[in-house]
Amino acid sequence: MLNNKRLFTSESVTEGHPDKIADQVSDAILDAILKDDPNARVACETTVTTGMALIAGEISTTTYVDIPKVVRETIKEIGYTRAKYGYDYETMAILTAIDEQSPDIAQGVDKALEYRDKDSEEEIEATGAGDQGLMFGYATNETETYMPLAIYLSHQLAKRLSDVRKDGTLNYLRPDGKVQVTVEYDENDNPVRIDTIVVSTQHAEDVTLEQIQEDIKAHVIYPTVPENLINEQTKFYINPTGRFVIGGPQGDAGLTGRKIIVDTYGGIARHGGGCFSGKDPTKVDRSAAYAARYVAKNIVAAGLADQCEVQLAYAIGVAEPVSIAIDTFGTGKVSEGQLVEAVRKHFDLRPAGIIKMLDLKQPIYKQTAAYGHFGRTDVLFPWEKLDKVEELKDAVK
């Protein structure tokens, strides 16, 4: 008999992973600037490696931010507070190399500076995209958060791994860690069980592998994963190399924007290639990806599809998206053409329209930079709102 089961795997990383440190530092700097200057232009890249961080990019702002102070506070919050961890917020070196935004880019983004503080139609029309590019948003009804199960559980496990470190439950854990979850789907594409869970966590030198494996199951996996999804066939790989003492930036260099699949949908949807962290909302890499998730989530919540992927594309200096594409993977209750028309009618997808619609000039970005930008249960981001459901239903009647 033919076995129609299907496996799909996604991963997440903890806030102490080198690439995630870089994302959080970039977004902490962005938030510090937006708090005093909501109209600032920020493109902030971070590199972390043993004993140092490099902050580079283009920033145009009317405010002053003590960048080294922001960096140190962020590293401290993550948990790199002792030299024996291989990275220490107090003693690390911090290099900065910041320029202003290119005037060639700026003139395409804001032709109408006189409308800068007004939400007028003229300002929205005059604000062009900060770059060309394509962005995707996705939603599915397989979880209550409208996220794929594998990435949702990966984030929940990674967050739990950090929580039990920070609250002292497992005080031998260190900040770096990774999680991977493999979900089995039945022939109707419904998730039925967890096939494999991988957890790799940095730890103190004096703890045994057996204790780590026992504690991670008891304090991280079992309290997080619904018991009906785990059975005797579920495989657990906990620190499968046997040792993970050297970690964080001492073990691997980290860079902003290197965890774009972790940040989004765990590989189940397509990705346009642009990262989010360190970018102000005039950068459509970030704001349009948030808008695309907002659109897709409302379509699925409205019952118009079981799965939905939305693609938006832009030209630099042009306000209107050059294309809007929707794929419901055969699960749509109405045609994809009808959905596109409804989206054009009820969502303003011009860059300034997105910023206004989702209130994106707020300093909310640091909290997005670990454990996913979408489907979070610990914080409600504006692009997760379900306030367009009735409008979409009415539009396709």
From Swiss-Prot:
Annotated ATP binding sites: 17, 176-178, 243-244, 252, 258-259, 279
- Sites binding L-methionine sit at 58, 101, 252, 283
Gene3D superfamilies, per this entry?
3.30.300.10
The Gene Ontology terms for molecular function here are:
ATP binding; magnesium ion binding; methionine adenosyltransferase activity
Q: Where is this region: Flexible loop?
A: 101-111
One of its GO biological process terms is: one-carbon metabolic process
Pathway(s) this gene product operates in, as recorded in its UniProt entry? Amino-acid biosynthesis; S-adenosyl-L-methionine biosynthesis; S-adenosyl-L-methionine from L-methionine: step 1/1
**Is Membrane a UniProt keyword of this protein?**
no
Main enzyme class: transferase
Task: Tell me its EC number(s), please.
Answer: 2.5.1.6
Q: How is the cofactor bound?
A: Binds 2 divalent ions per subunit.
UniProt keyword terms in alphabetical order: ATP-binding, Cytoplasm, Magnesium, Metal-binding, Nucleotide-binding, One-carbon metabolism, Potassium, Transferase
- Give cofactor(s), names only: Mg(2+); K(+)
Q: PROSITE patterns of this UniProt entry? A: ADOMET_SYNTHASE_1, ADOMET_SYNTHASE_2
One GO cellular component term: cytoplasm
Pfam families membership: S-AdoMet_synt_C, S-AdoMet_synt_M, S-AdoMet_synt_N
Q: Mind telling me which InterPro entries this protein's record contains?
A: ADOMET_SYNTHASE_CS, S-AdoMet_synt_C, S-AdoMet_synt_central, S-AdoMet_synt_N, S-AdoMet_synthetase, S-AdoMet_synthetase_sfam
Q: Which NCBIfam families match?
A: metK
The record's family statement is: Belongs to the AdoMet synthase family.
Q: This chain belongs to which protein, by name? A: S-adenosylmethionine synthase
